[in-house]
């Protein structure tokens, strides 16, 4: 399942590679399409329409929420709490339904295209003059779902985060200091749980995150509890981003003009998936 992606990509066209990369992470497949697509677009010097960027951003945050639901529910299960995983899966289904209504896939969206996104799977008939990019009722259903996500995160905090048994089994356990995290190149929620306020969304322009207001949750102790807590709080921030993106959705096309035969020019580019780069790494590149 996770073998030979680079070799497989050598014998496929650029549009076909999208179906490979979203299988790298089955829990948040949509997010894996973004780096490859953005890298190809940079090499081809393609400017993606703003509406397509917003749709990508919304689905990217939904994928993040879906992933965090799995982690938070399974994490509680690992320390002896059986019930939370069922609540997590129920709430996650609501988010997956939205992703499926747009992309046609729950785990493997294959939705991004070099230069934009494809028409929504649940949008009904399309024509060259009028392409339905989002299914009917998507805005309404998304707002309801995101409010439910915020409620679910609050429920997680009350039922699990405040549980004395859970705290005893996670607090001051598996401590990862900020210094050690930086030294080993740790990124994402694990790095932020160690107290480093660093997030790819604020450091690059691969999606228009700079247009929205949100916080970057961090931990204090870098222990097992903080790594759980940061993800719960991130679900709330992701829901806030989605709600803002829905309210500010621009009009316009879904796809930039691209050649019928996609051929990325020879060159080198880098779309960062690393959420933190230390000063030492900058001074001593390897």
Give the ranges of each region predicted by the language model:
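Active-site bordering "gate/hinge" segments
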Residues: 1-278
């Amino acid at each position: 399942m996770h073998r030979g992606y680079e070799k497989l990509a050598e014998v496929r066209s650029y549009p076909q590679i999208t179906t490979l990369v979203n299988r790298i992470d089955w829990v948040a497949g949509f997010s894996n399409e973004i780096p490859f697509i953005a890298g190809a677009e940079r090499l081809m010097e393609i400017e993606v329409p703003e509406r397509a960027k917003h749709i990508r951003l919304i689905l990217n945050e939904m994928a993040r929420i879906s992933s965090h639901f799995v982690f938070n529910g399974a994490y509680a299960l690992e320390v002896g709490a059986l019930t939370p995983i069922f609540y997590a899966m129920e709430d996650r289904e609501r988010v997956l339904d939205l992703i499926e209504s747009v992309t046609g896939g729950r785990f493997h969206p294959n939705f991004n295209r070099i230069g934009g996104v494809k028409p929504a799977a649940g949008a009904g008939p399309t024509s060259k003059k009028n392409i339905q990019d989002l299914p009917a009722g998507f805005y309404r259903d998304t707002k309801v779902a995101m409010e439910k996500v915020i409620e679910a995160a609050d429920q997680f905090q009350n039922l699990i985060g405040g549980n004395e048994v859970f705290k005893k089994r996670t607090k001051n356990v598996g401590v990862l200091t900020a210094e050690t995290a930086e030294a080993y190149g740790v990124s994402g929620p694990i790095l932020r749980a160690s107290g480093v306020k660093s997030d790819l969304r604020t450091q690059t322009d691969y999606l228009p995150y700079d247009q929205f207001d949100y916080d970057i949750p961090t931990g204090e102790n870098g222990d097992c509890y903080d790594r759980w807590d940061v993800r719960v709080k991130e679900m709330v921030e992701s829901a806030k981003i989605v709600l803002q993106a829905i309210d500010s959705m621009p009009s316009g096309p879904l796809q930039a003009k691209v050649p019928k035969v996609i051929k990325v020019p020879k060159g080198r580019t880098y779309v960062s998936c690393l959420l933190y780069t230390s000063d030492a790494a900058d001074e001593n590149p390897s």
